Amino acid sequence: MIQQESRLKVADNTGAKEILTIRVLGGSGRRYAGIGDTIVATVKDAIPGGNVKKAHVVKAVVVRTRKQSRRPDGSYIKFDENAAVILKTDGEPRGTRIFGPVGRELRDKKFMKIVSLAPEVI
């Protein structure tokens, strides 16, 4: 469960290493974000010479969560860390590579570019 003030690892090559959630998008009272949900975040840690800098406000999609999420077939999926991929304004990923596995829920939410770049879809 990702909520306001949650810190996530960045799973792409934009130059950001860690982001802090400012807001969960999708309704005025929405509190939690799961896999495939979009958030607004600020960059807390970045590498020098990267595409995004520290203190930039970005949109990102959650690709991994430590909290288990239930799938329609009754199975559960959870990961070892919370991670997100930074997006452009049109919803495409800003980076050109994705690191680590991503959840199958991204395919259902039409993030096909992220699914195709990911090394593994679980």
UniProtKB/Swiss-Prot annotation:
Repeat keyword on record: no
Listed GO biological process terms: translation
Keyword Signal assigned: no
Keywords: Ribonucleoprotein, Ribosomal protein, RNA-binding, rRNA-binding
Organism superkingdom: Bacteria
InterPro entries: Ribosomal_uL14, Ribosomal_uL14_bac-type, Ribosomal_uL14_CS, Ribosomal_uL14_sf
UniProt-recorded Gene Ontology molecular function terms: large ribosomal subunit rRNA binding; structural constituent of ribosome
One Gene Ontology term, aspect cellular component: cytosolic large ribosomal subunit
Classification via SMART domains: Ribosomal_L14
SUPFAM superfamilies assigned: Ribosomal protein L14
Gene3D superfamilies listed in its UniProt record: Ribosomal protein L14
Disulfide cross-links: none
Cross-referenced PANTHER family: 50S/60S RIBOSOMAL PROTEIN L14/L23 (PTHR11761), LARGE RIBOSOMAL SUBUNIT PROTEIN UL14M (PTHR11761:SF3)
UniProt subunit comment: Part of the 50S ribosomal subunit. Forms a cluster with proteins L3 and L19. In the 70S ribosome, L14 and L19 interact and together make contacts with the 16S rRNA in bridges B5 and B8.
Family that this chain belongs to: Belongs to the universal ribosomal protein uL14 family.
Main function: Binds to 23S rRNA. Forms part of two intersubunit bridges in the 70S ribosome.
HAMAP family assigned: Ribosomal_uL14 (MF_01367)
Name this polypeptide is given: Large ribosomal subunit protein uL14
Organism listed in the record: Micrococcus luteus
Name of the encoding gene: rplN
